[in-house]
């Protein structure tokens, strides 16, 4: 099974797929408490907003109709850096050290992303990542979350693409990323791919989740998702390739815009799953609710990646220096 993970930044599930969210009790409230340091002044707030008068995400709805929508709950701080670091590496904020969008003090070098874990499981694997937010893929930025793996880049085995066309803000960058990603997916069919789009988050910050602009942004990225799914659907139709398509988000938005704290509307995420080529793999069919750090392990298990282990009697990864005391003159240790 090949994997396409699509990350839609800042999407409110209760507005994109209101009927499905309302029908699942696991979407109503977080399954674990938030960090009190990031408590919202007004408390957790309302659980749901006012659904749009007409559907805004037909592609997501079609994917869900042929697959399933799983609740995912983010752990505050509900910002993009901590959110994507957790979603893409399968680690908590404490483990990866990402607490802010500045990535100060991160430990991402020891927290490999989903694509790198696929490669580690089988070094023949071809991987691809494209992102509107450079911090996820660009080594010159504060991250990146996705490991660079330059040796694999040289031979085209690992490809990274960051959107640079900001002439129309994230909207133009999203179009650029989608165009590149759809071409690679359709013509090269990597074994695992991640595509990030940020237009909805930009709209949420500009006008808030209660605005017409926010709903229009959801519709725009939904159309981008359709292009990406079409790219791999053609490979399934012509080549018989089996594809697992997954869609997720890193946080929601308040009605007035913004996120970062522990309101229900910003902590709620989702994992939309759809398989081209058969029923969902058993590990995914049994899911009821996830936390952000459980998304990558669930997807890896579904495509056949098993966690590696190192069995040793020493503490791995710890740097310890010898004391500057000189030799003991014990002949057993003189060489």
Segments the model singles out, each with a brief description of its role:
Residues 3-7, 14, 70-71, 86-88, ...:
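Structural recognition of the beta-strand scaffold that forms the well-ordered cores
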Residues 15-28, 36-188, 295-301, 313-321:
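Active-site-proximal alpha/beta segments of enzymes that process anionic O-linked groups
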Residues 19, 99-100, 205-209, 282-284:
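Short acidic, glycine/proline-rich loop/turn micro-motifs
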Residues 20-26, 55-56, 210-213, 237, ...:
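Glycine-rich, phosphate-binding/catalytic loops in enzymes
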Residues 103-104, 111-112, 122, 136-139, ...:
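Membrane-interface soluble catalytic domains
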């Amino acid at each position: 099974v090949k994997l396409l993970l699509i990350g839609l930044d800042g999407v409110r599930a209760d507005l994109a797929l209101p009927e499905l969210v309302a029908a699942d009790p696991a979407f109503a409230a977080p399954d674990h408490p938030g960090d009190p340091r990031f408590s919202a002044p007004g408390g957790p707030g309302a659980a749901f907003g006012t659904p749009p008068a007409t559907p805004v995400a037909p592609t997501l709805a079609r994917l869900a109709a042929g697959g399933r929508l799983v609740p995912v709950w983010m752990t505050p701080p509900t910002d993009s850096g901590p959110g994507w670091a957790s979603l893409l590496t399968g680690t908590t904020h404490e483990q990866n050290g990402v607490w802010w969008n500045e990535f100060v003090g991160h430990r991402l070098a020891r927290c490999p992303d989903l694509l790198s874990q696929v490669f580690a499981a089988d070094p023949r694997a071809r991987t691809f990542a494209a992102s509107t937010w450079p911090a996820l893929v660009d080594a010159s930025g504060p991250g990146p979350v996705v490991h660079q793996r330059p040796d694999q880049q040289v031979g085209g085995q690992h490809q990274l693409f960051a959107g640079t066309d900001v002439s129309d803000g994230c909207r133009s960058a999203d179009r650029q990323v989608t165009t590149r990603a759809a071409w690679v997916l359709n013509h090269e069919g990597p074994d695992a791919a991640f595509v990030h789009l940020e237009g909805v988050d930009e709209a949420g910050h500009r006008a808030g989740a209660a605005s017409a602009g926010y709903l229009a942004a959801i519709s725009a990225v939904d159309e981008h998702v359709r292009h990406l799914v079409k790219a791999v659907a053609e490979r399934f139709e012509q080549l018989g390739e089996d594809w697992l398509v997954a869609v997720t988000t890193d946080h929601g938005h308040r009605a007035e815009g913004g996120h970062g704290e522990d309101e229900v509307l910003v902590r709620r995420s989702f994992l939309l799953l759809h398989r081209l080529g058969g029923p969902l793999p058993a590990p995914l069919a049994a899911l009821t609710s996830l936390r952000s750090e459980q998304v990558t392990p669930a997807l890896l298990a579904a495509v056949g990646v098993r966690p590696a282990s190192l069995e040793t009697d020493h503490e791995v990864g710890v740097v310890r220096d010898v004391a500057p005391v000189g030799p003991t003159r014990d002949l057993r240790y003189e060489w």
